[in-house]
Amino acid sequence: MSHYIANLRDIEFNLFEVLPLGAALDAGTYGDLDADTARSILDEVSKLAEDVAAETFVEADRNPPVFLPDEHRITISDDLAKTVRLVKEAEWWRLGLDERAGGTPAPAALVWATQEMLISANPSAT
C-alpha cells in the first residue's frame, strides 16, 4: 500500500459543494467538460497518483534528483524516470491548456486538484 491516498471526497466537496464548479461545467462554459466528466478525471488522476506516482516516492526521497550545472542536466534513478514518463504519457498536464495548444480547457480549480494529487503523491515525479 502506498503512503498516499487521495481524499477525493474532500476535493469533490470543495469543487462541487463549496465552489459552484458543477454549475459552470454543466452550463457548457468549458465545452464538453461537464461535472460528471470532471469527477471521472479526478478519479483517474487519483488512481495515477496513488499507484504510479506514489510507487517511487520513498526511492526518490532517498535518492533525489541531482542537478549537474556544469553539464546542464540532472540525474535521476531509473525507477523515477519510469514514473515521470508514465505520468507524462497520461497527458493530464494538458488539462487547462488552450485547445490550440493541444489541451483541454478546464477551470483552474480542477487543474489545481489534479496537480495537488500528483504532487502530493511524489513531488520528484511532477
Residue ranges of model-derived segments:
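Amphipathic, small/basic residue-rich leader segments at the start of a protein or domain
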Residues: 1-126
